[in-house]
């Protein structure tokens, strides 16, 4: 029997530069099939370029919460008029209508089979693009495994470093984060499964170098810094080793928001984010100035 190599690529978040290197690495490793498990766009402003690469590589593509997020804003399930959503509006407006229609039609999970091995692939979970599956929710993972008519449950979403384990003889795999990994500066994560004769023979957790300075320059050239520097700086903190500063920013923003208004979510939200995090514009600007020492733009 011939061994089939399947690449699982998750959480690109618009980082076309990282994706380009991942696809080169996959080709060098003789990958036969590609599965993209969501969060293709939205965070870095290279959505069209990212989606064109994805579409030309595979038809096995899922939506993540970031795609659902754009769809639901489009459907006016949230009010996105405050400052923290300016970059999201910019990235949505930059997408071609063809690519908007493409993400609208993406499924949130897939059941696939290679050489007799059944895979269930989702972004968050088989239930929702937003549901978290990680080590803290072991009971939930075990519940899905017990209900699973498949040999493997594969997902992303949490931006954990790549990991896998076997539960009741079934593979549970987090494919990591290809575009905005908080664990490795200038490295993209993805996974190659080698499948043969009804078995997963090998699980290769891949780390691929990409040029973070190219990402920085491409952000500058995109024009998004004229929209809202704060969020783009926070996003970049997440990939250049300053993730702690990013976490502290949002932790402090929540504290200040609660002190001043008593709530930190958007009332009346109708989408997947029932309690949508929302910070007043003055808090966003104030903390943006406070955290400038961590920013590169």
Protein language model features and the residues they cover:
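Active-site-proximal beta-strand elements of phosphoester/diester hydrolases
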Residues: 4-13, 118-125, 172-176, 204-205
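Core catalytic region of metal-dependent phosphoesterases/phosphodiesterases
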Residues: 4-102
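Active-site metal-binding loops of divalent metal-dependent hydrolases
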Residues: 10-12, 38-40, 65-68, 124, ...
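Glycine-rich phosphate-binding loop signature in dinucleotide/nucleotide-binding domains
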Residues: 26-31, 114, 146-149, 192
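Internal, conserved structured core segments that host functional sites
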Residues: 103-141, 145-148
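A short secondary-structure junction signal
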Residues: 124, 130-134, 164-167, 184-187
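Anionic-ligand binding region
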Residues: 140-152, 156-166, 170-178, 188-190
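Acidic, His/Gly-rich catalytic cores of divalent-metal-dependent hydrolytic chemistry
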Residues: 167-175, 179-297
């Amino acid at each position: 029997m011939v061994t089939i190599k399947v690449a699982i690529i998750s959480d690109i978040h618009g980082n076309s530069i990282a994706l380009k290197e991942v696809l080169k690495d996959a080709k060098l490793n003789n990958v036969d099939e590609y599965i993209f498990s969501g969060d293709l766009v939205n965070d870095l402003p290279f959505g069209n370029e990212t989606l064109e690469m994805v579409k030309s590589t595979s038809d096995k593509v899922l939506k993540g919460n970031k795609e659902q997020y754009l769809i639901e804003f489009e459907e006016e399930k949230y009010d996105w008029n405050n400052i923290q959503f300016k970059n999201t509006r910019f990235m949505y407006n930059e997408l071609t209508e063809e690519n908007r229609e493409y993400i609208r039609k993406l499924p949130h999970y897939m059941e696939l089979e290679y050489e007799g091995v059944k895979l269930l692939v989702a972004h968050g979970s088989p239930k929702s693009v937003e549901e978290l599956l990680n080590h803290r929710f072991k009971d939930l993972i075990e519940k899905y495994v017990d209900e699973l008519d498949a040999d493997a449950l594969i997902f992303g979403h949490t931006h954990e470093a790549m990991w896998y384990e076997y539960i009741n003889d079934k593979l549970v795999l987090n494919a990591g984060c290809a575009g905005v990994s908080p664990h490795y500066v200038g490295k993209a994560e993805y996974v190659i499964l080698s499948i043969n004769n009804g078995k997963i023979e090998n699980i290769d957790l891949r780390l691929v170098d990409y040029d973070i300075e190219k990402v920085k320059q491409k952000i500058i050239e995109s024009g998004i810094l004229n929209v809202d520097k704060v969020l783009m700086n926070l996003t970049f903190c997440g990939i250049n080793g300053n993730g702690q500063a990013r976490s502290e920013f949002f932790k402090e923003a929540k504290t200040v928001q609660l002190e001043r208004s008593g709530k930190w979510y958007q009332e009346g939200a109708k989408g997947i984010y029932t309690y949508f995090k929302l910070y007043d514009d003055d808090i966003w600007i104030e903390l943006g100035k406070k955290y400038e020492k961590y920013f590169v733009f």
